[in-house]
Structure formats: C-alpha cells, structure tokens
Amino acid sequence: MSVSNKKSIDMTSGALWNKILLFALPLAASSILQQLFNSVDTAVVGRFASSQALAAVGSNSSLISLMINLFIGISLGSNVVIARYIGEKSEKNIHAAIHTAILVAIISGFFVMIAGQFIAKPVLLLMGTPEDVIDLAVLYLRIYLLGMPFIMLYDFGSSILRSTGDSRRPLYCLIVAGVINTLLNLVLVIVFRLGVSGVAIATVISNIVSSSMVIYILTHESEPIKLELRQLKISVKELKKILVIGIPAGLQGMMFSIANVCIQSTINSFGSSAVAGSAAALNYEFFAYFLVNAFAQAAVTFTSQNYGAGEYNRCKKIFRISLVFALVLCGILSGIFVMGREFFLRIYTTDADVLVFARQRIIIATTLELLTAVYEISAGAMRGLGYSLLPAVITCVGSCVIRLIWISTVCKVVHVFWVLMIMYPISWVITGIAMMTAYYIVRRKCFTFTH
C-alpha cells in the first residue's frame, strides 16, 4: 500500500533532516501568513470603519481563539491516528479514520454554528463587553459563526493532508483564501461601508474557499487517502482514538486562552502604554513561536508514522532533529528581532512611553522564546507516540497555573512590568524540564513494551 504522491513526504525511510525541514517550513509560513492576514483585517476595520467597529471585532478575539484552539486540538487527533495507520500500512483503517474525521468536522461545525446564534450575546455580556459595542460585537460573532462548518472542514482536511507529509497544499489554500479575504475586506468595508458585517462576511467567504479547496484535493487523491463523500460515516473505534488524542490537546489550547485573558488583565493594570507596548512586542514573539510550533507539528506526524512502522530509532532521531531546528531557527529569528528592536517596534508605534514597555517585553520574552522549543517538541513527540493527556496536563500546570500563581502573588507584591515579563521564561524553563523528563519516560515505556 502506498499513500505517496508528488506532494507527500516519505517519512519512514531516507534522510530525516531535509524532510522535516520541508514539512515544517510551510507550516510556519501558514501561521505567519494567517497572522499577517489577521493584522490586515484589524487595520482595515480600524482605519476605514470606526473605533467601535474595531472594539467589536477585538472583543471577540479571545472567544474565537478559545473555540478555534479547541477544534484545532481535536483535528490534531485525526492527524496522529491517520499518520500511525500510514506507518502501519493499514489501508482499511486509514479510510475509516479519514471519513470519520470529516463527518465529525461537519457535525461539530454545524452544532457550534447553530448553538452560537443563541448564546452569542449572553457569552459576550458575561465577558464584560462594553455596552457601546455589544450590538456590533454580537452581529460580528453571529456572522462569523456561520462559517464554523467550513473552518472545521479546513482544519480537519488539512490535518489529513499533513498526516501524509503534505504541508504545502494547505498553505496554498490558505494563501488563496487570505488574499480573497483581504480584497473582500477592502471592498465590503471601504466601498460598501458594511463595517463589522463586511469584515465578518469576508471571513466567512474566505473560509468557504479554503475548505472547498481542501475537500476538492481530498476527493481527487488516490486511495487510501481519497475522500468519498457518499461513504461518510463515523467509525466508533476511530472516533475514540481521535478524541483520546484530540480532546486533551484542544483543552490545553483552551486553557492557554483562559490564562492569557488573566495575564492581559494584569498587563492592563499598568496602563494603556503598557497594553500598546506589550501588543507591539507580542507580534514578534508570535513569529518566532510559529517556527517552534511548526517543528512540534513535524515531530507529531513524523513520530506517529515511524512509530506505526516500528522504526523506533528514527523516532529518537526525529525528536533530536526537530529540537535542534526549532532551537536554532527560533533563536536566529528572535535574535534578529531583539537586535533590531528599535526598527521593528517603531513599525507599530513611535510613542516614547509605549516603546519603554515594548522594549522590556521584547528583551525579556522574545530573547528567550527559543526555550519554548524544549517543551513543544517533547510534547509533540509524546503525542506522536499516542500520549496526549500527559503533555496537556504538564503544559497547563507549567504554562498556565504557574503563570496565574505568579500574577496573583509576586506581581501583587512587586507591581513592576519587567517582573510580570520574567514570568514567561521562568514558566518555559519549568515546563521544559518537566516535559522532557516525561518524554524520556514515555519513550522508554513505549519502545520497551513494543519490543
């Protein structure tokens, strides 16, 4: 059995370093492009609509992030399961897992879309959305939620493609959809003056485009990756396997979102200059982190395929190569941002007070962003081996609970911005040590048991 095509990567034989690099870089590019497109969305609505429209879109960001992180995590479960079956050369199971994943995407997408129409306003009120923007915020969210089935189809469909080693075609779909989204934003907001509605409609249409492209690709693949729409049905066995991996990963993403809301509240306590400065520096942290996350996803998929194929020594090499790439490339990019911080930060602001806070964040957090590679790659390798709950628990404790304890104790006593910022590298070190230790224990258990 073969799932190879000119876009896929043979993960179970040959040199690893070049294949991991070829797989990870398009993933990093996808994340970076998505961030850039989101920035364009914000710029268009802020510049050509109104401050209320900008606030309405912004007030939804944490809630939308919460939902997206949950389902991206669940889609990771399908990636791991299908990659394992590819390694095992189990054609029947690949077919069942793919059709289960796509049907789960459709059902859950429609469920969130419908339920969201009823709970949009209560949830936004619960989050403390200001009265002067609540109506616009509800309007934006309700329109945005109409695209949830398509968001889910893209996430699950691209995860299926990545399980074969194909990370380029999901990138191409994202580029096309992102360009369409940007153009529609300009037309609907500037020409037709639809404001918040225009931004939301543009997002829905772009999600329809990206998901349609991914589904088209899958329906025109060769067996056993080929998607047959008439054969869509849920296999309980495959669903359980997908959820065992996916739910812990999704809940981890949700915990991150909740913790970030609390951290943002502490940043807010330092005033508007701190909020603006932190936001400016955070953009560069995102770009550096996207490299780490891409190699973590590579570790998941490569490890899962090779573990399924019984290539245990390659699993060890995958961990080492992914970690080195993530550390080096993230370190180089972070170093460029830190050394050129005056130039990069002034792209966003020239306000002297804002720059004071921006410099503190970029010097402390961005400089040490490469530390995230230790726990991200270790967690990715464990998920590839089929362990998802353990890395989720370690990450939640190390990167969420510890940070919340820090801001509720240390920052209460020493209310200084840089003291808040050192919370990040401290939590990264603690989480990294715990995660790498757990990885070696899990690896020894897996390889000893299978032998």
PLM feature segments, named:
Residues 1-24, 82-147, 180, 191-247, ...:
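Short alpha-helical transmembrane segments in multi-pass integral membrane proteins
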Residues 13, 17-36, 40, 63-70, ...:
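Residue-level signal for short hydrophobic patches within transmembrane helices
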Residues 22-41, 143, 177, 206-210, ...:
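Transmembrane helical elements of multi-pass membrane transporters/channels
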Residues 36-55, 124-131, 187-194, 254-287, ...:
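Helix-terminus/linker motif at the lipid-water interface of multi-pass membrane proteins
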Residues 49-62, 137, 141, 200, ...:
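Small-residue hotspots at the loop-to-helix junctions and early N-terminal turns
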Residues 54-114, 151-170, 264, 277-341, ...:
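Small-residue-rich hydrophobic transmembrane alpha-helices
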Residues 75, 144-162, 170-181, 199-214, ...:
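Short runs within selected transmembrane alpha-helices of multi-pass transporters and secretion channels
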